[in-house]
Amino acid sequence: MSASGFQKAFEGYLYENNTDGSGKASSYLKSIEWLHAMLDIESYGFSDCKDVWSINDVSRLSALRKRVLEEKRKQSESPWVHPNIPVSYLRDGYCTSALADLIEFIPEFEHVQRVMEAHAQHTNSSELAEKLNFEPTIPDGYVHDPQSKDGQNRICEAKIRIGQAAFRKMILSNYQNRCCITGLDITTLNRASHIIGWSDPKGKKIRMDPSNGLCLSATYDAAFDQHLISVDPDNRLLISKEIQNHYSNESVTNYFKNREGQAI
């Protein structure tokens, strides 16, 4: 993938995960632009990183992040504190945080690409599930001390997060980014729900099976997770007795009761 394509993919990742509306995504993207300018002033041996988007080596980016932290600690003594560069991007940690997110993004991006390539080549669900029954690769440099307990925990958490991100991408693609109950197509509001849960031992072999997933908008995903709704073997919506017997207001009727038996 080209550097511009990689940049666009990272932008999408940031905005997709910027759910609190804080403006973090745009600040991180801007901080990388200013980091390029800082490296133009003094590269410290990182001249290859003057275009960060051309670097997909996690170890190299981790080394760059370490240098940024060192310059941050120097405060006004750093040559990167320059009249033409807003000081807040270095001083307040935006550059280091942006690089941390980029380091997290790279193995997820690479794993999702592998999953989607396999998804495009296989139409048989069980065959695809077997093909995708592999763990994400966590590259060197992703954690500071991979042999420590904390490092091992971070790697384990990363593998789960990356696997779920790939599953989400595949399920939303299968459903054309539309909630299978309402047709809602606002991607940031839709979830990839596991029919058999990710942590359920019975579902270990089918975690990545496309037939084990539904695209549901947030309300229905929460209801599904709480067993308030389910699906029968013919993929028709079932409403729990708890909803049927204990809730009677108009919203519940419209959202749930009137959809009983709907094919999804």
Model-predicted regions and their roles:
Residues 177-181:
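C-type cytochrome heme c attachment motif
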Residues 16-108:
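Non-catalytic DNA-binding core/recognition domains of DNA-processing enzymes
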Residues 90-165, 184-189, 254-264:
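A boundary/linker detector
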Residues 1-8:
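Ser/Thr/Pro-rich, acidic low-complexity intrinsically disordered regulatory segments
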Residues 156, 162, 166, 174, ...:
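A detector for short metal-coordination/catalytic motifs
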Residues 8-18:
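Calponin-homology-like cytoskeleton-binding modules
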